[in-house]
Each structure stands twice: as structure tokens, then as C-alpha cells.
Design a protein with these regions (language model features):
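Short, surface-exposed alpha-helix to beta-strand junction/turn motifs within ectodomains of secreted
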Residues: 61-86
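Short, solvent-exposed loop/turn segments at the edges of extracellular beta-sandwich modules
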Residues: 118-124
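A structural motif detector for short, solvent-exposed N-terminal "entry" segments of globular domains
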Residues: 24-39, 47-51, 124-179, 236-243, ...
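C-terminal motif of bacterial Sec signal peptides marking the signal peptidase cleavage site
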Residues: 19-22
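Solvent-exposed beta-edge/loop recognition patches
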Residues: 103-108, 190, 195-340
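Short alpha-helix capping/helix-loop boundary micro-motifs
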Residues: 182-189
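Buried hydrophobic-core signal for structured, non-transmembrane domains
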Residues: 56-58, 158-163, 246-249, 309
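Aromatic sugar-binding surface patches on proteins
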Residues: 90-100, 198
């Protein structure tokens, strides 16, 4: 649950703004929000950012005379975390950094809140509350090993299987183009994984017992859960069909791996949508897919709903191309197991 509150005070009037919105997972990183209207003399928070050390940079539109900020681990302000406020530029008082005194006070994936008040030299003030999720400063590295991109029937959902190349945390790592039209991407929750583990993301979820295996104590009871891999689940029951697609794994905007595939019977000369074409270009420009982003250089098989495409991960190989991938018919699909 994310909440963003802004209270503005001037010497003659009080204006209160409130904004409330929700999302499905705390693993999503905070986004910049603009809700500023009204008297242009009011102090405005024009931007804020969070870095890998959970330092929060605040940028205001006016020079600030007084600033006070605190960090809390709960929205009710009962768990105060020791923090410091530092001015970032000597020439002007518009940019400040709020930092933790003890970096271990906020772990990867932990929620925390920055609350503060600023005043300019005319007495105009701004009260603000921003919520964040502890940054992933130790991301794991994933490589795609198998994809079943089409849906046949319940409970056989589409899935993407990934091998952990470098141990670390999954928190905030995204899989692009595996969700709905409104929510096309999936974001992993906080979960520490070890090198050599297999991760399976099931695009759909039909069972209440299908739980994300964020640690070893959780065993998912989903119908197609793998006893050989760590299972994670989308919350969808219905998804658009993707016969041709560009799937990307990225962490903080950096592409880790990608797969580009197209249905050989469709004879498409271009990607079916601009979003897929952009994802394909991103995969190519990042250097993980070769030799181009064009659909002609994607994997070309007639992939039926019961089939998958897979490959054997080559150690220290950072680039992928269509020739590395093979079609696995229904009996050869190895969901959650090492590929043959």
C-alpha cells in the first residue's frame, strides 16, 4: 500500500492535498508523483529519488530556510529510525539528502517512510510524507532457460523458467511483457536466491494455495508448482495471447537477459505491437540479443500451447540468439528442471 500526503500552509490560508493509491506488491519501487496546483507561492516538492543505499534526495522549487525530516519504519510514526539531513549544494537551499545513520536499519524490501516539513524565508511551508521500499543493493542475476508462452487449459499456465547465475535478492527485478495489457510486467518480491537455483514464474494463478516461495520454509501448493524450483505466481486468470513476443528481465532498468520469439506460421515481417518492438530494440541495444531487434532474427517455431522453447545455459555467455533455442514438445517440457 502506497500513500502520499502533502499539506501546504501559507500565512493566509491552509490548503490540504491528499492522494491515495494502491498496488499489488511492496516490491515495486516508488514513482514520482505530481499533484501540485493552486497558489504558486506555496513551496513545492518537485522531485524525489532513492538510491541503492536508501538515501532519499528531495528537490524543492524554492530556497528552503528550515527543514526537518524523520524516517519511520511504520506509517503510524511509532518506529523512528536515526537519520541525517544534508544540503547538497552550497549555492542554493533547494536540494537535500535524507540518509540513514545505520544502513542496516532498512533491509531489502522493507517499507519505510520519510516525513518532514520545510519552510521558506516568507513563512510558506510544506508538510510531506513519502513511502519507499528498501532498495535491492544485492540483486541476483537471472538467465532465461525455458519459456512456455501460450495457454492451453487450466491449470497449465504459461511460464518462464530462469537460472540464477549470481546469488542475491530478487526484489524489484522485473519480467517485461508477461502480464495483462494494463499491467504488462511482473515485479519480484524480496527473496534471496542462490547460484544454481531455478526460478519459475507462472503467468497465471488458479489456486489459493499457490504461494510465492520467497524462502525455504514456503512450499507452494499450486497445481503446476515444481518441487525442483522456486515458484512465483502472477495474479491473473486471463491474459492476452502472445504468439510473438519480446520478454526482458531487467533490474533497475539494466537488462539481464531477453528472449525474442515469433510464430513461424504467421510469417510476420514486423512485431505485432509497438511495445514489443521497443522491448526487442531494448534487448538488442543492451547487447543480450543478437544479431538485431528485427522479428526475422527472433526464434522461429510454431509453438503450440503445450510446447515450450528452451536452451542450455552456456557459462559466461552474455549474449543470446535464436540458434541457441530449441522447440520442446509437450513430453519434453522440463518445467522447473534442468533442460535436456
Amino acid at each position: 500500500m502506497k500513500r502520499f500526503y502533502i499539506f501546504r500552509f501559507t500565512t493566509t490560508a491552509i490548503v490540504i492535498f491528499f492522494m491515495f493509491f494502491s498496488c499489488t506488491s511492496l516490491s515495486e519501487m516508488p514513482e514520482f508523483i505530481t499533484i501540485f496546483t493552486g497558489n504558486m507561492d506555496n513551496v513545492k516538492l518537485v522531485n524525489y529519488t532513492q538510491d541503492k543505499e536508501n538515501n532519499v534526495c528531495l528537490i524543492f522549487d524554492k530556497n528552503i530556510k528550515d527543514i526537518s525530516c524523520n524516517i519511520f519504519k511504520d506509517e503510524d510514526e511509532t518506529l523512528l529510525i536515526a537519520s541525517n539531513v544534508k544540503k547538497l549544494h552550497e549555492e542554493e537551499n533547494k536540494q537535500f539528502m535524507v540518509s540513514l545513520e545505520n544502513k542496516t536499519d532498512v533491509e531489502i524490501g522493507d517499507a519505510f517512510f520519510v516525513k518532514g516539513e520545510v519552510k521558506d524565508r516568507f513563512g510558506n511551508s510544506l508538510l510531506f510524507c513519502l513511502n519507499f521500499v528498501g532498495a535491492n543493493n544485492n540483486p541476483c542475476l537471472l538467465k532465461i532457460s525455458e519459456v512456455r508462452p501460450l495457454y492451453s487449459k487450466k491449470p497449465k499456465s504459461e511460464f518462464i523458467e530462469m537460472l540464477v547465475i549470481k546469488e542475491g535478492n530478487l526484489s524489484g527485478i522485473k519480467i517485461l511483457n508477461v502480464g495483462s495489457k494494463k499491467e504488462p510486467d511482473y515485479t519480484f518480491p524480496p527473496a534471496y536466491v542462490k547460484k544454481g537455483e531455478l526460478i519459475v514464474y507462472h503467468w497465471r494463478c488458479f489456486d489459493e494455495d499457490a504461494k510465492d516461495e520467497v524462502d525455504a520454509s514456503i512450499i507452494s501448493k499450486g497445481t503446476e508448482a515444481s518441487s525442483f524450483a522456486r515458484d512465483f505466481w502472477g495474479h491473473y486468470k486471463s491474459l492476452p495471447k502472445r504468439k510473438s513476443n519480446a520478454i526482458i528481465i531487467e533490474e533497475n532498468g539494466v537488462v539481464q537477459d531477453a528472449i525474442l520469439y515469433a510464430d513461424s506460421k504467421e510469417n510476420e515481417e514486423e512485431w505485432p505491437s509497438e511495445s514489443i518492438a521497443n522491448a526487442a530494440l531494448k534487448a538488442f541495444e543492451s547487447g543480450v540479443w543478437m544479431p538485431s531487434s528485427e522479428i526475422k532474427d527472433a526464434i522461429h517455431y510454431h509453438i503450440t500451447p503445450s510446447a515450450s522453447v528452451g536452451r542450455k545455459i552456456i557459462p559466461n555467455e552474455n549474449k543470446s540468439s535464436a540458434k541457441q533455442w530449441y522447440l520442446y514438445k509437450s513430453k519434453d517440457v522440463t518445467l522447473g528442471k534442468r533442460n535436456k
